[in-house]
Design a protein with these regions (language model features):
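Conserved SAM/AdoMet-binding glycine-rich loop
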Residues: 1-51, 56-57, 61, 70-72, ...
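Residue-level "edge-of-site" marker
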Residues: 2-3, 25, 67-68, 141, ...
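Conserved strand-turn element in the central/C-terminal portion of the radical SAM core barrel
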Residues: 4, 37, 50-76, 99-114, ...
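Catalytic cores of alpha/beta
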Residues: 5-14, 60, 71-85, 144-155
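Short hydrophobic alpha-helical runs that function as membrane-insertion/retention elements
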Residues: 21, 62, 158-162
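Conserved, mostly hydrophobic/aromatic
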Residues: 22, 54, 84, 128, ...
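Aromatic/hydrophobic pocket-lining residues that form the small-molecule binding cavity
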Residues: 44-47, 77-80, 121, 188
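Auxiliary Fe-S-binding modules of radical SAM enzymes
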Residues: 89-213
Length: 213
């Protein structure tokens, strides 16, 4: 779902919405238009200001992210850090999460403009953990199982499992419109066992609306 109006987010929160994840993808305004030439998604300001609208509507948790591979990743993640700092100042009751998905082979065969190594991704996660001790750091199934298992002990707080990358993928089959390839194909149960083997407790849900009363 593309970024909505504040009143739409508010209605959704009143209906039980807990969190919203919206990837800015890149903070490079001119290049953003190259990647998104048409429709509402092409309006840079509408997308980047969508996080304010979420905060104004009282969304409990806001997820942010840039797509590593589009533009210089150091610039993009620095801009996201500044954006996160701004949001924390203005919507301090909201929780935040960040994600740094690296581009993988896709249906459109779009090749990354920038390559980030495993060491660089780990360095970035460490830097964000130092920058913001409380932010949730998510690592998606774009990354391989070995990397995810190791980084879960070194700064990441959330790892996905059983992900579908095609539009409507959780409701339709087969994956006819897959947007990118999944590297870690373990089932949720298998990921759960891996986390437990590390000595950690698996938490599937960490919030409920009743806690805000």
């Amino acid at each position: 779902v593309m970024p909505l109006k504040s009143e739409d987010y508010y209605r959704l929160t009143q209906s039980g919405l807990n969190g919203v994840v919206c990837f800015q993808e890149t903070y490079h305004k001119d290049r953003y238009k190259v990647y998104h030439p048409k429709g509402m998604k092409s309006i840079f300001e509408w997308r980047v200001n969508g996080f304010d609208r979420m905060g104004q509507a009282g969304v409990h948790k806001i997820g942010m992210g840039v797509l590593i591979g589009l533009e210089d990743w150091r610039t993009d993640v620095t801009m996201m850090a500044i954006h996160l700092q701004y949001l924390r100042k203005h919507y301090w009751q909201t929780r935040y999460s960040v994600n740094f998905p690296r581009m993988r082979p896709s249906e459109g065969h779009f090749q990354p403009n920038v390559i980030m190594t495993d060491k660089e991704l780990a360095q970035l996660i460490f830097a964000f953990r130092i920058f913001d001790h409380d932010v949730d750091i998510s690592v998606s199934t774009r990354e391989n199982a070995k990397f995810r298992d190791h980084i879960a002990t070194l700064g990441a707080t959330s790892i996905s499992a059983g992900s579908k990358t095609d539009p409507g993928g959780y409701a339709t089959y087969p994956q006819a419109l897959e947007q990118f390839s999944v590297s870690d194909e373990r089932t949720p149960a298998e990921v759960e066992q891996a986390v437990k083997a590390m000595g950690y407790e698996v938490v599937w849900k960490d919030w409920d609306k009743i806690f805000d009363r």
